[in-house]
């Protein structure tokens, strides 16, 4: 069975289908998710907290994501696998960001990369997609910004922050 593609995910969205995504960091969880017909798997930087025991995602390196994502892609056939871009790997330096995203695609075999941030990362997303790298954006509660927020805080409760989330999603 072929791996799902970005076009498959877009069709699911266009058809109004509810899309399930689970996080997987290892062979066991990836196989269980695939057996349960979960169409999307995220190899997220939360592995820093869940697997490595850190109190945030900040210490996670690109090499950690590549290692875990390669395991997930190796043991699954169908799920669309999303690889997280850890803290400071998707920066204002577009060339470095392209290099990091390309490593995730080439070395780990992910279907797409995930970046945290809002409208300010639009130029980065444009550069990545023009280079042929599919991107999934993560807005709202962004763990890589936990230090800036002073901890994990719900976003969008106040009018101004809710409006900013809408702008970011656009």
State where each predicted segment sits:
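Alpha/beta enzyme core
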Residues: 2-170
């Amino acid at each position: 069975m072929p791996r799902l593609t970005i076009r498959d995910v877009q069709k699911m969205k266009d058809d109004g289908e509810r899309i399930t995504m689970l996080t997987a960091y290892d062979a066991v969880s990836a196989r269980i998710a695939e057996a349960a017909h979960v169409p999307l798997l995220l190899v997220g930087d939360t592995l820093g907290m869940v697997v490595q025991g850190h109190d945030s995602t900040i210490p996670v390196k690109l090499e950690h994501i590549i290692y875990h994502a390669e395991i997930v892609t190796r043991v699954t056939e169908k799920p669309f696998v999303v690889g997280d871009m850890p803290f400071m790997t998707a920066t204002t330096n577009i060339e470095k960001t392209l290099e990091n995203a390309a490593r995730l695609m080439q070395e780990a075999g992910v279907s797409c990369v995930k970046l945290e941030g809002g409208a300010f990362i639009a130029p980065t997303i444009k550069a990545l997609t023009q280079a042929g790298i599919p991107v999934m954006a993560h807005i709202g509660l962004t763990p890589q910004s936990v230090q800036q927020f002073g901890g994990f805080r719900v976003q969008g409760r106040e009018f101004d922050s809710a409006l900013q989330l809408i702008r970011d999603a656009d």
